[in-house]
Amino acid sequence: MSKFFINRPIFAIVIAIMITLIGLLSMVNLPVARYPQISPPSVRVSTMYTGATPQVLNDTVASVIESQIVGVQDLDYMTSDSASTGTYSLSLQFNQGSDPDMDTVNTQNRVQAALAQLPSEVQQVGVTTTKSSGDMAYIFSLNSPNGTFDSTFLKNYGTNYLMDAIKGVKGVGSVQEFGSDYAMRIWLDPSKMQKLGITMSDVTSAIKSQNVQAAAGTVGKNPTNGEQAFQYPIKIDGRLVTEQQFGNIVIKNSNGTVLHLKDIARIDVGAKGYDFVAKSSYRDPNAPSGEILFVEHRPSAGFAISLQNDANALETISNVQKILQEQSKSFPQDLEYHEVVDNTKFVRASINEVEHTFFEALLLVLIVVYVFLQSWRSTLIPMIAVPVSLLGTFGAFVLLDFSINTLTLFAMVLAIGLVVDDAIVVVEAVEYELKYNGLSPKEAAIAAMKNVQGPVVGIAFVLAAVFIPVAFMGGMTGILYKQFALTIAVSVAISAVVALILTPSLCALMLKPHVQNEREDFVHRQLNKFNRGLERFSDWYGKVLARLSHRLSLTVITLLVFAAGTGIVFHFLPTSFVPAEDSGYFLIAVNEPPGATSARTVETLDKIKDFLEQTPGIKDNVEQVFTVSGFDLLGGSQKSSAGVSFAVLKDWDQRKSSNQSVNAMVGAVFGFGAKSVPEASVVALNPPSIPGLGNTGGFTMYIINKAGDSAEVMAERAQAFMAEARTNPAIQTVYTTFNTSTPSLQFEINRDKAAQDGVQLTDIFTALQGFYGSIQVNDYTSYGKNYKVVVQAEDQFRQNADNLNMLAVRNSKGQMVSIANYITKDKTSTPSSITRFDNAMAVKIGGSAAQGYASGDAIQALKDAAAKTLPAGYTYDWGDQSREE
C-alpha cells in the first residue's frame, strides 16, 4: 500500500489535507467544557404548603409523592427536603445514560398520580416537575447602587426583560432566581376586622368572587336575523389590576353601609415571599491608587444559569454575556448588572494551560527529533505528520460525541509522544537506506516501508489493545476514562495511517541522497560530540545486557521486586475521584441557631463580608462578594436561619503563592467563624470538582432511619456518629444541618368546645393561616404576567402569640367568637427541616478531608465511624460525588 502512495505523493498529500480540514472544521464546532458530560440526569419536583411545619410536609406531601415515585424507570436514588418555610423539594438522580426527557416525563406521570392525595392547599399551588442541572455555570446580579429600586423590582425586572432572551440562548438549561415574584399583598388589620365583624373567610371569599376573569361575550354575534350591521365585543373589568381596584372590593353590605377591603387592610404591590435577602459588593475600580475599596450594593437580585448536557459552555456563556451587555444599554437609571461567578473562566484557564503544555510538548519533540536525526528535512517530516494525526482526531470526536475538555486535551498531549514514534520509525528506516545502501530517496522509501510497514501496524494494534478496553468501563468513571482512552487510541490509529501514506511520500519528496564527507557546520560538529557520547553509552548498555542475558534469574527477580513494590505503594496511596481544584471562588455556608430570624442571618453574612473585604492578605485577593440570606446551601432548602456567600477571587495569574489559594482563604474563614461568630456554624467550602454533582465539594453521606425512630432519636444517632468521625485525623470537617431544637409553639385546639359552640375547625385553621402565615387567594395580571394575590396580617400583629384574641370566627348562630377561646399554647421544639433518602427519613452529613488526606481516606473514616455507632435499623448511603467514588 505504501508503494502506491510513494508513487503518487500528491494523492497522499490530498488525503492528509482532507484529514486536516475535517479535523479543523470539527474542532471549531465541537462543544467545549471542563469535563465530559458525566453528571447523571436529574429531575426536581417542588411545591409549597404555606404555613406547614416540616413534619406536616413530611407526612402529607413528601411521603405521598415519594411513595408514588419509588420504582420509576432508571431511578438511582432520590433525596428530599421539607423546610420550615413550607417548601418541599425532591431531587431524583437517574442512572447514567438514561434519557433526561423520558426521566422527566416518567416522573411527571407519577406525580400526577399522587396529586389527588395531596392537601387542597398544595393542589391549588401546584406541583412542578422540571429537568434539573446542578451545574451553576454563570451567576450574575442586578443591583441598584443608590437604592432606587428594591430587590423585588430587580428580580422581576430580570424575569420580565432578561430571562426570555437568556433562556432562548442555545445551550441554556435553566435559570435559578434568587428573589421573589411580585404579589398583590393584602395586609389585614385584625383589630378592625374584629370590631366590624369580619372573618378571614369573609375576606378570601370576597376576593375570590370579585377578582375573576370574565368573558361577557359579543353583542350581535351570529346567529342573528341578519339586521345587525356590527358586532360589539363586551369589555368588562373582571380580574382586578391596581391597588385601588383591590381596595374597592366589597367585603360587607348591610343596612345601606358598604364595607370595602381598604377599610380593614393596607394594599400594595410587594413580594410573594420575603425569604431571600441578596446583597452584592465588588472591588471599586475608581479607588485611589494603592487602596482597596469595595462598592456595596443594596439591594440586589441574583440569577444562576445552568447549562444543558450537550452545551458548548464557552459559546453559551459568551452569548449570555452579549445579551446582558446589549440589554444593559436600556436599563433604567441606577440599575446595573455584575458578574458573580463565571465558571467558563476556569474552563478557559484550564484549556489554555493544556494548550501551552501541548505546544511545549511539540517543541520538545522537535528538539529531540532534530538532535537524534540531525537533519532539518528529516525533522520536518514528523512535525508535519504529528499535527495531521492530532487534528484528524478532532474529526473522530464528532462521531464519538466527545467534547473538547481537559481530559481529551490531556490525552492529545500524551498522544504526541506516541504518534511521533510512527513517523520517526519510517524516517529512520529511510535514512538508513539512504546512508548505508546508497539508494535514491524514492527507492529508499519503498525499501524501508517493506521493513517497517508491519511494525507500524503492530504498534497501532498493541496500543489499541491497551486503551480501547478502558472505554468499556461502566459508570461515571468509565465515561471519564472512555474519552481519555479513545482519544489516544484514535490518534494512534490515524498516526499509523499517516505513517503508511503520508510519511513515506514526504520522505521520497523531501529527503536528499546521502553525500559522503559532506562539509560540516558548527551545529553538526556539536552534534557529532553528542553522537560519540551516545555511541559510548550504547556500547556500555550492550555489555550490561550481555551480562544480564547470562543471569536470567537475577533479571526476573528484579522485575518481580519492582512489581511487588509498585503494588505495595499503590495500596498505600490515597484515593480520590478527582482532585480538588482552585475554581477561582469559594462558598461560605452560614447556619444560625435554630429559629434565628433572617435579620440575624444577614448580620452574620455582613460580618463575613466585612472580614473578606477588610482583612489584610485576604482583601488583596477578593474581587467580589455576593450573599444570599434564606438559602441553606448544605441542606439544599430555604431557611431563615441560613445563608450563603460567594467569595470571588482574583484571576489565577495574580495569585501565585500558596497563601493566595482558595484553600488558604477557606482556612482563614473557618478561623474567623470560630472566633467572631461562635454562635453560628460557618463552613467555607470549595465548589464541587465535577459540575452537577452537588452544591459543594467534599463528601456527602446520608444516615437512613429504617427503624421508625422519632426525629429526636435520629438526631442523637447522627451526633454520636459525627463525634466518632471527628476523632479520625482524615476528617477536617463533618457537619449536618439537621436539628430538632428549632423553637416552636404547639397550638392545641379544644375540638369538643368548638363543636359545642358551632365553630367550624376549618374556619379556625383559615384564620390562623391567614394571620400568622399567608393565603394565596388567586391571581392578578401585571406586566403581561400573572402574579398571586396574598392575604396576611400586618407585621405588628404577628410578632407574638398573645394577639390570638384579635382573631374571630363566626359560629353557626352568626355570632363572632374569638378563637383564643379554643386554643391553648405551649412552647416546644421541632426540626427546622426533614430530609428523606429513598422514601425514608434520613440525616444528611457533609464535610471534607483533612489536609494531606484524600477523599477516599475520609470516606473510609466515615465507614469506620458508622460501623461503631449506628445501631440496628440504621444504615447509610452516599450522594453526589461520594456516591460515584
What are these regions (language model features)?
Residues 107, 367, 379-400, 415, ...:
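Small-residue-enriched core segments of transmembrane alpha-helices in multipass membrane transport
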Residues 2, 416-430, 453-472, 479-527, ...:
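Transmembrane alpha-helices and their membrane-interface boundaries in multi-pass membrane transporters
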Residues 10, 17-56, 75, 112-121, ...:
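Transmembrane helices with small-residue packing motifs
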